[in-house]
From Swiss-Prot:
SUPFAM superfamilies: Cytochrome P450. This is Cytochrome P450 monooxygenase astF. It comes from Aspergillus oryzae (strain ATCC 42149 / RIB 40) (Yellow koji mold). Induction: Expression is regulated by the secondary metabolite regulator cclA. One of its GO terms (biological process) is terpenoid biosynthetic process. Pfam families: p450 (PF00067). Its EC number is 1.-.-.-. Keywords: Glycoprotein, Heme, Iron, Membrane, Metal-binding, Monooxygenase, Oxidoreductase, Transmembrane, Transmembrane helix. It is an enzyme of class 1 (oxidoreductase). It is a single-pass membrane protein. InterPro entries: Cyt_P450, Cyt_P450_CS, Cyt_P450_E_grp-I, Cyt_P450_sf, Cytochrome_P450_fung.
Amino acid sequence: MLPTLPNIAGRINTMATFLLPVAIGTIILLFLYGKYVTSTLIPGPPTLPLIGNLHQLPSDDRRHVLAQWHKKHGPIISLKFGWSSVVILGNIAVTKELFGKRSLKYGSRPRMVMARDCMTKQMQTSTLPWGEKWKIHNRIQLSLVGGPKIRSYQSLLDIESCKVLYQLLSTESLVTCFNRFKFNIIYTLAYGKDPDQNESDFHEILELADHFTQTLTNATWVVDLFPILNCLPRRLAPWKAVGDDFHRRAMGWFRRNSEAAVKSNSWNWTKHVQFNEDTGNLSVSEMQYLIGVLFEAGVDSTATVLHFFVLACTLYPDAVTKARQELDKVVGSARLPTPKDLPQLPYVKAFIQEVLRWRPITAEGLPHFTLEDDKYQGYDIPKGSTVIFNYWSGHMDEDTYQHADQFCPERWIERPDLPLGVFGYGRRACAGRRLALMSLETLIPKLLWAFDFRSPAGTDHGKSRDPGTEHQGALIKPRSFPVSWHPVSNDRRLIIERLFQERDKDLDTVLDDIGKAFERY
């Protein structure tokens, strides 16, 4: 992803060498030592003129190359792409310090020509620089997916998680079940519409989200390396047509659903934002966009985490046994687990944390941009620097996580202070992290309680092997692996079927109850 991230050229401090009279040489050297001893350039691999380090990074999977550079040069390295310098952070403690504690300095974004200017017309929240517009976007999104009000969504999460369990009784496609889980939640909340009655919207938004990430990660857009080229006329700038086509399609989807949501009888995010939130000087199109992009951020990422959960179940059956024993002791076999049980389920909670750490779903995060000069561990990080967190290296760091390549929920019980940086830090941390975690903590305990996930009989004697991972757009996903699943018992199958039939099918009533609870918080 790195070469496609638009960057702003970093300023590099250099020391000039002067011919000095011998008589005062010692005095000047001492002066320079006192001034510069703590001012050191960030290390990194050697570069070539014009292209920098582009030739050293593979186009598909950069994790191993970056890991080698971090091992050689340390947790903070500097790379060059075209005219732009990029600082890469490969350690969670360093990232937490800079992006978290020093968030005022690191809380902006560099210019992202293809992503921000061409494809989203400066309406995609995650690409906006620090300023009043981003503050409004972030405040509204946090009010919907990040604050205490998300507790009001629990009834909908229970309905959708039970729906996943019921579908798994008969389907052969984990992909569809997991993709629909988060889509159904956000679609229902955003627009007050029944997702089961709008199948085409599901496929269209997945296609748009995939197109956005594929466009950004499968090609090195020259305009991101040399932003001045965006001044060229359209006939000499083919990326402009690509961006315009994407924006037209995305805006059409957002507008169509938003206009229907305003006319809906039930409570939904769109109506709440339009009539209850202070939207400043945002246009109607921008309000529609900032709600719509919540799909891009949440649907595919949650599904990917769930796929890694299933992979962990097939590779580490002993961990599944421990989790299920805990569930049987606390919950029993007569009902499904709920989030209220989690305080009494430390191993199950640790299982979820370890899934998130063991296989981060993205290699590198979106770039941060420094608003002030900074100095860290003797390194100068000038104002206008692009700084990126290497999620994969950070969560595979042996200094932080012993035997980091192993799936080990026990580590979170033995060391509850371990950091988990998958949602980022500071101002630019994932706005929907609380809803994402709430969704996983609702569904995964139910999956552990209800199903056995195993390698099919006859597949390497029933033993599963790690298939490895692959990049699909901006996400890291498991390569295809054989898996079969069946209910833990027939009694649990019957409970799933009964709860599915008894679920509240009146969506307007569900949403109105959510709306009343939402407004009370």
